A protein has these predicted regions:
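PRPP-associated nucleotide enzymes
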Residues: 1-175
Length: 175
């Protein structure tokens, strides 16, 4: 079995000085590793009987779409403001780089639908908190949040738990 953590590459000073970027593309490029990641996410997600996967732009789409396919669920996009063509609901989405907004189409999640949220990486937890808020405002029931990587030194999982203690959080790799 592939060691997912060993494939992730540190890129210093990207996207700006002082940041050490975790490059996940080697996991995506390696068929065995990528399939392992999706299989492990699916194993966890199945515990919650999701009816939909919603993923955060943009690298979250890679894992979210593959997970939705594996789970045979619908897939919803959570995008930055102004990227979706139809009527949307918007929430504030501050992150470690800037203050942004997340949007989803109003019809992307049905009332009461059980939703697993996916992103590539959990850093400060701000994106996850905003995405969960958006799903709830759309009428969905967030049942889990998952990512390939957690940067545990940034306490993102703690921030998510403080905001939404009812939503379990999972990451396959922790730094």
């Amino acid at each position: 079995m592939k060691d997912l953590k060993s494939l992730i590459v540190d890129v210093p000073d990207f996207p700006k000085p002082g940041i050490v970027f975790k490059d996940l593309t080697p996991v995506i490029q390696d068929a065995e590793a990528f399939n392992l990641a999706i299989d492990l996410m699916a194993e966890v997600a199945r515990r919650y009987s999701p009816e939909r996967v919603a993923a955060i732009e943009s690298r979250g789409f890679i894992f979210g779409a593959a997970l939705a396919r594996e789970l045979r669920t619908g897939f919803s996009l959570i995008r930055k403001k102004g990227k979706l063509p139809r009527q949307t609901l918007t929430v504030l989405a501050p992150n470690e780089y800037a203050v942004e907004h997340f949007e989803a189409h109003l019809d992307s999640i049905q009332p009461g639908e059980k939703v697993v949220l996916v992103d590539d990486l959990i850093a400060t937890g701000s994106s996850a908190v905003s995405a969960i808020e958006l799903v709830k405002k759309l009428g969905g029931r967030p049942v889990a949040f998952m990512a390939l990587v957690e940067l545990s030194f940034l306490d993102g999982v703690k921030k998510i738990a403080e905001a939404y203690s009812e939503v379990p959080v999972f990451a396959l790799v922790k730094f």
